[in-house]
A protein has these predicted regions:
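Surface-exposed loop/turn elements that mediate protein-protein interactions on large endomembrane-trafficking
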Residues: 247-255, 292-319, 352-359, 394-406
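Repeated scaffold domains used in trafficking and secretory/extracellular systems
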Residues: 58-65, 221-227, 264-274, 329-332, ...
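Beta-sheet-dominated scaffold domains
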Residues: 327-424
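Surface loop/turn motifs at the tips and blade-to-blade linkers of beta-strand repeat domains
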Residues: 53-57, 260-264, 323-325, 364-369
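Hydrophobic or amphipathic alpha-helical targeting/insertion segments
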Residues: 234-246
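Active-site-adjacent structural elements in enzyme catalytic domains
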Residues: 230-231, 240, 251-252, 264-266, ...
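N-terminal beta-propeller domains
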Residues: 1-100, 187-214, 268-350
Length: 424
């Protein structure tokens, strides 16, 4: 019997029925497979990162790798709870510090219980935040509990008291002990998943009673996300709707990321470095730099050239700001050939360097082609590809909707509440 060479088409087709796809010799399902030169090829597996003995706390939302000027390789990881640096096989916690307080006898222990109450006036902490206690000695033991450690805050009692949990029970009971202690608070953790908001301002004025949660909502509270980039050899990290921080590579892995300072915007959706012109962009940021209440989801700022601290425009610098008109908020951005591509939830825009006095200008490149999530776009050799709310798109000078044989399979089972967690 004559043998026939069966040639199958690359990719997976979930738009047609298995019977119809089979007629055209198309695959209808796959797992751990990629297509190379038109043929399926297995993934070659993965390994632990960094290793099984080290724990990454939280859900990783963004990663970024780079090489320092002295040749060291780094990988930054941003989770909903921490910010890390991986160098070699070692993982370092570089989560920024929110506040440092000097306390006196703040600990109250209960015999045979691992729960400790900490007193700190106007602590400003939330459940899930991390705090580290030090007292200048090798160890600070009270009733068998070693307090010179990092702890997760498990309960907020009130504005002046919270609770932490040790790994074992206290051997005694003390009301107000520990001596002179320094409490170092890391920045407030973010939510691990997106949820709907049901509080004040969700529905129309006067609906329901004061202090009562609303029964429905169209307001989404996004999960914590990060944007990570390089300014030279240093790391720039922005927490979604939070602050922007710098980790100085030359200071070493024993140091933490720090705020850009009092002159930088206090809240932004994300950041991006223009590698060609050496400006730092902050998108969805504050119209008044020091006031988080003025955060505008369509407004963006760029720093002076070669500066992370100069944000106020003057006649002698290149700092400035612009506002995008189409859409309700800026979702994401990537650097491309000769421009920065910026997406709102409705449209695509190009930002180009135009020189003095305006520094940068913008023009709209497409409408009804918004981005679904912060990390759902990529640029490859000047061509951009992204996932929208209803389809996949590309831009090569013109916005095009991409044909996709798995489109219904993807979108029919999509949780739009958690769409900002998507990464492509």
């Amino acid at each position: 019997m004559k043998l026939t060479d069966l040639k199958f088409q690359p990719g997976v087709d979930k738009q047609d029925s298995p019977y119809a796809a089979g007629d055209d010799r198309r695959y209808v399902d796959s797992q751990l497979v990629r297509f190379h030169y038109g043929k399926p090829e297995r993934w070659k597996g993965w390994s632990y990162l960094p290793n099984p003995n080290q724990t990454v706390i939280g859900v990783v939302r963004d990663t970024h790798s780079w090489v320092s000027l002295d040749g060291n390789r780094y990988l930054a990881l941003g989770t909903d709870r921490k910010l890390y640096i991986l160098e070699g096989s070692a993982l370092y916690d570089i989560t920024p510090i929110r506040a440092t307080e000097s306390l006196t006898n703040p600990f109250t222990t209960v015999s045979s219980s691992p729960i400790v109450t900490v007193t700190d006036s106007s602590h400003g902490a939330s459940v899930g935040d991390f705090v580290t206690f030090t007292d200048g000695t090798t160890n600070n033991v009270l009733d068998g509990i070693e307090f010179n450690n990092e702890f997760e805050i498990t309960t907020i009692v009130d504005a002046n008291n919270y609770k932490i949990t040790y790994s074992s029970n206290a051997t005694g009971a003390t009301a107000g002990g520990g001596g002179s202690v320094t409490a170092t608070y890391q920045i407030t953790v973010g939510p691990s998943t997106s949820t709907y908001g049901y509080g004040w301002g969700v529905l129309t004025w006067g609906l329901s009673t004061w202090g009562t949660a609303r029964s429905s909502s169209s307001i989404t509270l996004d999960a914590r996300n990060w944007s990570l980039d390089n300014f030279g050899e240093d790391l720039i990290a922005t927490a979604l709707n939070g602050g922007t921080y710098q980790w100085d590579t030359s200071s070493g892995t024993g140091t933490r990321a720090v705020s850009l300072g009092a002159t930088a915007p206090v809240a932004s959706r994300f950041s991006l470095v223009s590698s060609d012109t050496r400006h730092l962009f902050l998108f969805g940021t504050c119209t008044t730099v020091t006031d988080a209440a003025t955060q505008d989801d369509l407004f963006f700022r760029f720093s002076d050239r070669e500066s992370l601290t100069q944000w106020a425009p003057t006649a002698e610098n290149e700092a400035g700001s612009l506002r995008i008109a189409d859409g309700s908020r800026i979702i994401g951005a990537v650097t491309s050939t000769g421009q920065i591509l910026v997406w709102t939830d409705q449209s695509l825009h190009g930002i180009q360097f135009v020189g003095t006095p305006f520094t940068f200008g913008q023009r709209q490149l497409g409408a009804n082609c918004g981005l679904i999530a912060q990390h759902a776009a990529v640029d490859v050799n000047g061509q951009a590809f992204w996932m929208g709310d209803d389809a996949f798109y590309m831009y090569d000078g013109v916005v095009k909707k991409m044909p996709c044989s798995v489109q219904d399979y993807v979108y029919d089972d999509l949780s739009y509440t958690n769409k900002n967690d998507i990464a492509c």
